[in-house]
Amino acid sequence: IAEIDLLDETEHAAIAAANRTTTALPLRDVAALLEETAKARGPLAAVRCGDRQYSHSDINDAANRVASGLRGRIGNGKSHPRIAICLPRSENLVIAILAVLKLGGHYVPLDPGHPAERRSLILEDCKPDIILVSEADDDAAKAAYPAACMAIEPLLRATGSFGHPHRETLPDHLASLIYTSGSSGRPKGVPLPPTSLVPLL
C-alpha cells in the first residue's frame, strides 16, 4: 500500500510548480538598491512609528544627511567604517542603519534596553569608529566612550543638499556584526554580508 502513488504525473508537476518559490537575487550594491527603491517608491509609505508616517523619499533624504554627517566625522580615509547604533526602536533606527550602509560601512546593533554590562562588553570587543546615540539617552556609552559617541538628532537637523554618498558595498564586505546572547559566556560577533539584506530590498 505504501508504494501506491495517489497522484499522477500531471498532479505531481502541478504541485512542484506551485511550490517553486526560489528567486534569483542580484549581486548588487546594497546602497545602490536603497537609492533605486527610494526613487521608485518615493511618495509611498516606508516607515510608520506610532502616529507618524514617513515616505521612502523622507527616509532616504534623512539617511543621506546622517551619512554625510558620519563621513564628516570619520573622514575619507576609512572606506568601511564600523558604526555601533544604540537607538530605541523608531524611525531614527531605520535611518541610522540605512545611513551606515550608504556610507559603505557596517553597523553593530546595540539595544539601549539591554544591561549596560552587555553593551560595554560588545563595545569593548568591536571597537567601533562611532557610536550613534540619541540626545535624550543618558547612556553608559556616553560616559565610557565620550569621544566615539555621536547623537543622531543634530545630523537629522542639518540643512542643505545631501546626495547619495556613492560608497560601494561589495558582496565580500560586512553589512552588520550582530552579537549573540552570550549565554555561554561573552557575546560573540556574527558577521552578516550585504547579500543577506538583498532579499529585503
Predicted regions and their residues:
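Residue-level "micro-hotspots" composed of small/polar
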Residues: 15
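Carrier-protein-dependent adenylate-forming modules in NRPS/ANL systems
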Residues: 1-6, 21-196
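N-terminal leader/auxiliary helical segments
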Residues: 11-12
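Short, intrinsically disordered, charge-balanced linker/junction segments flanking boundaries
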Residues: 197-201
